[in-house]
Amino acid sequence: MTDYRKILKQYWGYDNFRGIQEDIIRSIGEGRDTLGLMPTGGGKSITFQVPALAQEGLCLVITPLIALMKDQVRNLRERGIKATAIYSGMTREEIVIALENCIFGNYKFLYVSPERLDTEIFQIKLRSMHVSLITVDESHCISQWGYDFRPAYLKIADIRQLLPGVPVIALTATATPEVVSDIQQRLQFRQENVFRMSFERKNLAYVVRHTEDKESELLHILQRVDGSGIVYTRNRKKTKEISQFLNRNHITATFYHAGLNDETKDSRQKAWLKGEFRVMVATNAFGMGIDKPDVRVVIHADVPDSPEAYFQEAGRAGRDGMKAYAVLLFCARDKITLKQRVSDTFPEKSHIRKIYEDINFYYQMAMGDGRGCTFAFNIDEFCRNFKHFPVQTDSALKILTRAGYLEYTDEQDNASRIMFTITKEELYRIREQSEDTEKLLRILLRSYTGLFTDYAYISEDNLSTRSGLSKQQIYETLLSLSRQHILHYIPAKKTPYIIYTRERQETERIYLSKEVYEDRKESYVQRINAMIEYAESENRCRSRMLLRYFGEKNEHNCGQCDVCLQQHQSGLKSGEFEAISQQLQALLKENPLSLQEIKDKIQVPENQLMKVVSYLVSEEIIRQENGYLKF
């Protein structure tokens, strides 16, 4: 019997597996197609990395998350495990080298974005690889019912035909019962085989705060809850504004979004992980693959557009098992904003076709041409030229991607990378280099492994710090070495891409199927409504609401969300408490009242009334001043 724990100890230093990890690993070891449902922080990567290391051959990992892909490749290499990745934005030379290494270089892991599966070069090279396991991360993306459906995932079934007999492990942190069934069907599971880790987080208290002054409420929460925190907002500009607001109020904070360059994002992430900043204010670009177990509070200043997204982001709190809070700030306008997102996310079909037509004009693409062509895409410039709105343009391009006409990648930061183009022996024989160049070469060789066989990501900032040379000197020296054909240097580049997956079509022939458009729009509306229901509910346990959404039955209330605490503290049934609370708040909105005046107006037992008053005062929903209660 394979000793999986020995592998776990050797490479990760752990003595035992957690939760259902070992059950999933043994299922894969037996050659069975396996679906693992594990919440954020459940240790998904262990479930495919350990069995892959236990057998001969290569593990093919399909994931849409480029940042996570790079992070896992780096972590595996640091453990002495050969791993590489292929994704949009790489040069053809880089892709060929990575694929050749997987055929001849005894590599254990090849990470690939789903869009690469359909390329001719990938499918040719794949036939020569000894693949022992296919891993499908974020597997909900294969389901049209999932909140992040990606048509490229449907190509995985074709890959299974090229690799008959190779088992597949599908992983996701968020899947409704409908999606669970769809994943297994679309991945052609030989038989149903699902392992579920409970999505219940017993140490995490879910809270909704209804407020029209989110900044003050945010500050109030962070002053009452100690420890590290994350504040999520949908707007890049607001990440900076909220961060500045917190710093002005003596709470150390920094901000993070996809528009920042790689170096800035990396340095801020590391500073927050080390505790140099207490709070990270971010868009949803932050958090995937982040390992910080002691986050005490995650606050959503804006409402996510699906329970899946909310559950995943909120779940970054309390991974150490200690008490933590997930707080959603909700105001009257949020409901209107959520409804508006439907038209932003699903523009009219005529508008989508118009954007396709304008894209063709933008790139001067002739009818019948374009298949396989890749272009950098500046969405702001495009929208200025053709009078479109960026949000709807982004959505239209994603729908055209799902329909198979284009491949559109959001902004992605491709860090600088290098690879030596001569052998190590030839490098040592080179003379007549400057002292600075010699110094930089020595640091490169000490800092990065595998530079003679594969491209490695480098940081000019880190090289500058270690060498004492300026960042500009590092850049110029690497360019000089590249011109001398000693190494190949690809400077960092930050840009989205558009790739024509088909020849240019006549605009009126662009077909957006019911599955691609109407069904997905309906599903999106249902998720929006589920979030509104969650935020507005005042009498149902929030943990049970989330678990029920994901198909997990739970007969007991959590006892720690704001709804449960309200009911417990009052000793009233939820309906009774809510009726008194609403009546009291309605009276106080009209005029401040003394306690005696309230007793005269609300005819309920005094002990019940006082419990409601005490709770509303403690939660700062109402306040007491000079003998009067005020809203």
PLM regions with names:
Residues 277, 295, 299, 303-312, ...:
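C-terminal accessory region of SF2 helicases/translocases
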Residues 60-61:
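Gly/serine-rich nucleotide phosphate-binding loop at the start of the catalytic core
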Residues 1-11, 15, 19, 23-45, ...:
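Helicase motor core with emphasis on the C-terminal RecA-like subdomain
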